[in-house]
A protein has these predicted regions:
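Non-catalytic substrate-recognition and accessory regions of acyl/acetyltransferase enzymes
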Residues: 1-191, 288-309
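Generic, low-specificity signal for short hydrophobic/alpha-helical stretches with a mild N-terminal bias
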Residues: 26, 75, 130, 191, ...
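Noncatalytic linker/hinge segments flanking ATPase motor cores
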Residues: 71-74, 203, 214-220, 262-268, ...
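Charge-rich, low-complexity amphipathic helices
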Residues: 108, 112-115, 119, 234-236, ...
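Acyl-donor binding region in acyl/amide transferases
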Residues: 158, 167-257
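Charge-rich, low-complexity intrinsically disordered segments
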Residues: 255-309
Length: 309
């Protein structure tokens, strides 16, 4: 038991450091929240120690321990739900990606091979000077266990935090924790929308998620609602304003609220309006957009296939 207690304190130090009182306070809170859950913490650790693609993920990404002491992923998530979410995600990965790919994605950047520092290149367009990468970004673990980062040059435009796992009916599913934009995003979004024939970058990152979902063997897709956003758990502390406003996007892409208002169910395929139903003055724009997206679908398929089982 003494060794377990020491381990929980060490985990907190590894996550938060010890340079300031604020960091020490977080270490204390992590310790107090985990020390009484020995069975669950040992289960969590044992899962990763026997994880075939890489038994050292927790050693290299200590931040994953924070999911055991903080109400992350979605509002009012329980410790049991978070343990299951993490285990289900990593179990699903084994059915999709090669062991070498999983190990690479969860390696710290300094251990990634040259050319893969940002993870898997999902998509790029040299004419637009844009790229999209799939990676594990430790700072985004509050909302997901994967991040798709959409960039214009070296500037972030949007990122989506996602995870694999089980849906509300126990089916293989992909979960979107959030989609967030970056500073100067509005100006960039206008530029990108024009170049993509009226297709907004916020919708494009959903397109990228859906394309990835094709290769992840999922049967459904869900998104966390504004009501379910993890940070809204803490609104009772005085933060009265909602910190996420994504419901309009989920509705725009065909999502519907589930019986649990914390989640939307999202169609796996994007609806494309038939050309004949589009006003004549906009048909050329839509036709070019659809042709562009079809080309991107082929590129994404070619980019990811070498990482798949």
């Amino acid at each position: 038991m003494f060794q377990y207690i020491k381990d929980q304190w060490a985990n907190g130090r590894a996550i938060y450091g010890k340079k300031s009182w604020r960091e020490t306070r977080r270490v204390i809170l992590h310790f107090l929240r985990t020390v009484g859950h020995k069975q669950e913490m040992m289960e969590y650790k044992a899962f990763f120690e026997s994880y075939a693609p890489d038994q050292h993920i927790l050693d290299k990404q200590e931040g994953l321990y924070e999911l055991m002491s903080r109400i992350f992923l979605f509002k009012d998530s329980t410790l049991r739900e978070r343990i299951d979410a993490v285990k289900n995600h990593f179990t699903a990965l084994e059915d999709v990606f090669t062991p070498e790919t999983i190990e690479m994605l969860y390696n710290p950047d300094e251990l990634k091979p040259e050319g893969l520092k940002q993870g898997i290149l999902l998509w790029e367009d040299a004419d637009l000077n844009m790229t999209a990468h799939l990676n594990f970004m430790t700072g985004q673990r509050k909302e997901g266990l994967f991040t798709i980062l959409l960039q214009l040059g070296d500037q972030g435009v949007y990122h989506a935090n996602i995870r694999l796992g089980k849906g509300l009916e126990g089916e293989p599913a992909l979960w979107i924790g959030t989609i967030q934009g970056y500073k100067d995003g509005l100006d960039n979004a206008k530029h990108i929308t024009k170049k993509m024939f009226g297709y907004r970058p916020k919708n494009f990152i959903v397109f990228l998620i859906r394309e990835l979902a094709k290769y992840c063997k999922v049967q459904s897709m869900y998104a966390v609602s504004d009501e379910g956003f993890y940070a809204n758990t803490h609104m009772v502390r005085g933060h009265k304003a909602k910190v996420a406003e994504l419901d309009p996007l989920w509705e725009d892409i065909g999502g519907t609220v589930t019986q649990d208002p914390r989640f939307f169910k999202i169609p796996l395929e994007e609806y494309r309006k038939p050309i004949e139903e589009i006003k004549s003055q906009k048909r050329s724009q839509y036709r070019k957009r659809y042709e562009l997206l079809n080309k991107y679908e082929e590129q994404i398929r070619d980019n990811v296939k070498k990482y798949l089982k």
